Amino acid sequence: QENDYKITHLADSFEEFVRGLEHEALYDPDENEGDFEEDDADGEETDRTGVFTGFVLLSKGEWDKDQFIRDMKEKWDISVEEYDASEEKDDDALVFEVGDMLAAVSLATYPIPDGEAEINAENNYMWEDAVQVAREHRAHIMVAVLGKEKKVLEKGKLFAKLAAACCRQQYATGIYTSGVVFEPRFYEGFADMMKEDELPIFNWIWFGLYRSEGGLNGYTYGMDVFGKEEMEVLNADAEPEKLRDFLASLASYVLACDVTLKDGETIGFSADDKHAIIRSPGVSLPE
């Protein structure tokens, strides 16, 4: 089933990861602890808006930090400056500032627990080896972006740049984020869209596809990180590529223009291509 997600490691590891790498100037743990407690008390899920985190699967528990620093400069013209020599450094972790954002990259020398990466790899219908690669990974790199930057798209861009640079690591075999495991060359290639001033929509959002008795269905996964609702198209009479491209165009429009789709309105990308918008509980990704 396409929507069989299990993103527990992403949620459970993120807070621990941040606590270990926090920088007081950019991240106030006391303030965020209150948010977590309030959400728990209300019995609601924590708001994921602006929380960019993911994992680079590795076939061996090693990474080349110096290479990563070189790749960030070569690929994105971002100079990585670690904290000064008076502060303790960790060969397995790297924390640096980019404007008002904090980038954190850290090696974990063990697989993601409970077969979670393998389960989510099943959602990648575009990569035949996704499940096997996920099953065989032996370690992972945790990647996160946080800080005071208010423009969520800027945080998302930096996250994609970090993960794309990690794709060049010798032992990188997959990128686990947005509820799926991406092929590294796919992820890095689509991140290059940013060099043309385009949004890296295929790095941010997973466009799931599956068939039912009524036809082809498609859905987004990852819009919530940008403070937007997920979208789906149900029972479509369309080719998979057409449906995926439609959803990608729609997601790009919503994110780039900061649009909120309203129930009862119509949307389309040409005069003879109009679709009714219906707000309802999700079918592909039920609450």
Task: Give the role of each language-model region.
Residues 1-50:
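A C-terminal-region feature
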Residues 2, 51-59, 137-147, 287:
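Short, hydrophobic/proline-enriched secondary-structure or compact coil segments at domain edges
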Residues 38-72:
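N-terminal alpha-helical "arm" segments
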Residues 59-131:
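N-terminal low-complexity, intrinsically disordered segments
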Residues 74-82, 162-176, 252-262:
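Structural alpha-beta junctions
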Residues 103, 107-206:
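Internal, hydrophobic cores of structured domains that mediate oligomerization or house catalytic pockets
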Residues 180-287:
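Aromatic/basic-lined ligand-recognition segments
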